[in-house]
Amino acid sequence: MMKRWVISLLFAYPMWANAQSVEEYRQAMDAFDYEMPIERIVPEKGDSMFTPLRAKALKAMNRHSEALKEWDSLLQSDSTDAKVLAELGECYRSMNRNDQAVICYRKALKLQPENKFFRQQHLRSLLATGNYEASRDAAHAWLEQDSLSAAGYKFLGEAYQGLALEAPEMLLYAFTAYNAAYRRDSLDGHTVAQLAALFNDNKQWSEAVDVTEIYRRSDKMNIDVNRQNAKAYCMMKNYAKGVDRYEALKALGDKSFTTLYYLGISYYGMEWYHAAERNLLEAQKLRPSAPADVNLLYYLAKACSHTSSQQEGVAFMKEAINLTEPTDSVMVHLYDGLVDCYSRWHKGDPYEKIEVMKKAYSLNKKYTLFFKIAELYNKQKDYANAIHYYEKYMSMVPKDKQMALDETGKPMVGWTSLYQIAERKIKEIREESFFQHGIK
């Protein structure tokens, strides 16, 4: 009897010891001591008790290639283990080998068709490969099984967004899918952010505000949702709210190009030019090697023209012009901006300003530029050219704008129009010339 008891104890001891070791390894991993199981567990093919622990520890230490070998050794023992297939898929995803991850999750999904995690990871991996048609089909297959799945509609929206890169009309289907996902789960941050982005892209800014504000009642920390919320306020020209939201994003650690750019635009809209200049300069530094952003340069130049950086403002606007394709509408916009920058830069070369204004007139046909040109010539005491451009300006002013008139069309007492100023300047120049040279 004693002999049998001793033999039973001897057989039971290894099992007890293994259980103790497993618990010890798990405790070490719970304490983030991944090196301990990696060092102590000797890789042995088919050791199903310890191999998963070592594989998970290797993955946690970003030693994915070694972890792959461990999971693969287990798969050789049992190719129908869905859990091992999923772990193998996760390793492949971590290594950005998404094609292999798709294969692993597809096999796991065949073994457990109702497993939502396997289905989600299969779709995520498919989307990461850029195979949007297959992703769309997989999402539709999911929704055939579960038409109420918010996640299924969300992935369908992502698939259609990918297809829209080649066929823009697919964006409508993306919107429909995200809208369906939102109706089923209005608190999914990714869905809300994507739906709001589509609203913003379609200039439906109030709708973007609505969906993001509802989400923010339960979570104010989601970066993607807050970005779309802030952008919507900025595009609606609610610049104060835009500044508030973008500053909150910066406080959360978001100092991306987009956040700094739109924060600068919002400050510019509030006429806080120093803050606009500061944030737009920060945004520009984030793109040193990329092609310059013309819109960024335009607003940066305009902001600088209102601070002590007028010279830099002129340079930024010139850079924007040099980078722009010569389409009339864009060039008019930029040359108007350059004229404004030069007008505020009092130390700038007056003849450079004159050439810029002449170029601007050739694009926008704003005859008031002739008055500004005349003023510059007058300051340089180039009276012949000054008179020429004053007269050129006066010849183009409509009769109803030659005098300062009120709403009823009557002359305004104490007000002088630019036309009258030009008329007076010509008279003063000629009188001065007469007294100095005897020439009228």
How would you name each of these model-derived features?
Residues 50, 84, 118, 152, ...:
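TPR alpha-solenoid repeat register
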Residues 45, 79, 113, 147, ...:
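Short coil turns that delineate tetratricopeptide repeat
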Residues 395-440:
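Terminal, low-structured helical/coil segments at or just beyond the last alpha-helical repeat
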Residues 30, 60, 94-95, 128-129, ...:
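Register position in tetratricopeptide repeats
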